[in-house]
Amino acid sequence: MRIFNTLTRKKEEFIPITPGEVKMYVCGPTVYNFFHIGNGRTFIVFDTIRRYLEYRGYDVKFVQNFTDIDDKMIKKANEEGTTVKEIGDKYIKEYYEDADKLQIERATVNPRATEYIEDIIDFVAQLIEKGYAYEVEGDVYFNTKKFNDYGKLSGQSIEDLQMGASNRTSSVADERKKDPMDFAIWKSQKPGEPAWKCPWGMGRPGWHIECSCMAKKILGDTIDIHAGGMDLTFPHHENEVAQSEALTGVQFANYWMHSAYVNINNQKMSKSLNNFFTARDILKEYDSDVVRFFMMSAHYRLQINFSKDLLDSAKASVERLYNAIGNLENLIDEVSRENMNEEEVRYLNSLNKYREKYIEKMDDDFNTADALTVLFELTKDTNTNINVNSSKELVNKALDLIRELGAPLGLLQKITKGSLEDEIESLIQQRQDARKNKDFALSDKIRDDLKDRGIVLEDTPQGVRWKKIN
């Protein structure tokens, strides 16, 4: 398996620290609003990579944080007349709701920065003690000149970084720094801000130190994979490298991975530009399989343009795949022979070439676009060569293979007609009973839960009917 490593700017053979195990940290959302579809791409990409690593037999410890103390959160809390904690609680709940609908698996650990304040204070104190940080009137800055490798992740020279930082220096706070490139790892309290007691007075952590501390505390001094959106490469991830390696003296992460932007009209989607669509808005119109297919139709390091036309195209592609599955499932009731004959055994063995090709594509820096092509080739083959004269065993094994290769991509796992019919009919009956009892809240919940699973109900004069949607 080869991974493109941002640190070395080339593909490298993936060799985990501990054989069979992967320690992976992904920078999660700042929880002051619903996440937009650009953020969603990052979450879907690294969920897919995590799924594929598990498919290949790795035990993945997957950590994705919540930034729940930040300038944006303080601003939001002040605007709404509430507390930063209440804002964080609300949008963490909303994150889980949207992520679940996108079939994003829950992380092994979802740490909140505010749960690690004491650890962060200790981290900052050690950096001061080692001479890598200094305190000025309650603020603490990291001394970038003391860290000789500053700039190695983003590939920028010290001269370029200094020039850029000098151009940005404008505030009194900046003028107190020893160098324009120095960045805050602890911020003194301002009126109306939450704060914690520390040796430098009341204050709160800087953004960059939060991830360094949580990654170290949960995964150790050196982790296998650190990942996030491409926009985090500098300064966020660069600063994480500096802080962490200054403290421990060892490499922070062996592989750095970054997903590219989602653009609208060739401009990066972002809240600051107000050119974004929330994942929640998109999910009102498109199924999670469609959104995931759209995201994976391009390599994760390539930017993609967002448009309704492209989503509609993804929807049509997903429908083709589900139709292929549906055709096979319908055959289960039509075929009369149970077990495979010798010719079918040979044919089934020939289908292994699709699994091998799929693994070859995904092992090459998680090439999801080519992996999707393999899925289409497989479904075309099975739909051409499996028919009413085939055995039930062959039909089921072909279905198993299609779903097996869809699973790491988070695709093709929804209920289709012909499977779990008893469960659906039972839920429909429960809904009917609830309506008779005027328990419309329960009735609506059952309907919405089924819709989330890809099943839509239709109330007709002949009774309730259900069908699969994509």
UniProtKB/Swiss-Prot annotation:
Biological classification of the source: Bacteria, Bacillati, Bacillota, Clostridia, Eubacteriales
Main subcellular localisation: cytoplasm
SUPFAM superfamilies cross-referenced by the UniProt entry: Anticodon-binding domain of a subclass of class I aminoacyl-tRNA synthetases (SSF47323), Nucleotidylyl transferase (SSF52374)
Organism in which the protein naturally occurs: Clostridium botulinum (strain Alaska E43 / Type E3)
Protein's GO biological process: cysteinyl-tRNA aminoacylation
Tree of life domain: Bacteria
The enzyme's E.C. designation: 6.1.1.16
Gene this chain is encoded by: cysS
Cofactor annotation comment: Binds 1 zinc ion per subunit.
Named cofactor requirement(s): Zn(2+)
PANTHER family named among the record's database cross-references: CYSTEINE--TRNA LIGASE, CYTOPLASMIC (PTHR10890:SF3), CYSTEINYL-TRNA SYNTHETASE (PTHR10890)
Binding-site list for ATP: 271
Name of this chain's protein: Cysteine--tRNA ligase
